[in-house]
Amino acid sequence: KTETEGHVTRLEKVFAAIDKRPQGKTCDAIVGIADEGAEIMKEYKGSPALDAGLLAAAQAVEHYEISRYGTLKTWANELGLSDAAGLLDQTLAEEKKTDAALTEIAESVVNVEAEAA
């Protein structure tokens, strides 16, 4: 099972816990970050800065997800929905771990290569 599939499964459990049906919705913030990534690909095509720019866009997605899951976890705790808060916390921890891994890649390889070019 992929990490994303785990996130979906946990979200389905959160919705079941609050007796609501999940609905898909386009997230304008993520669309904006994706558009930014597309601009980076055009502007820096063939450049060592391309990887650094794409990594920055990927981290922007992670930071948005961390913000959303953190907020949802806080709300769940405030509403006394400890099971939902626990599920959201698991996903939040995974998002933070991914962000830390991206930071490590950026600092140890990608940004160094872009700067040296």
What are these regions (language model features)?
Residues 1-117:
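Amphipathic alpha-helical hairpins
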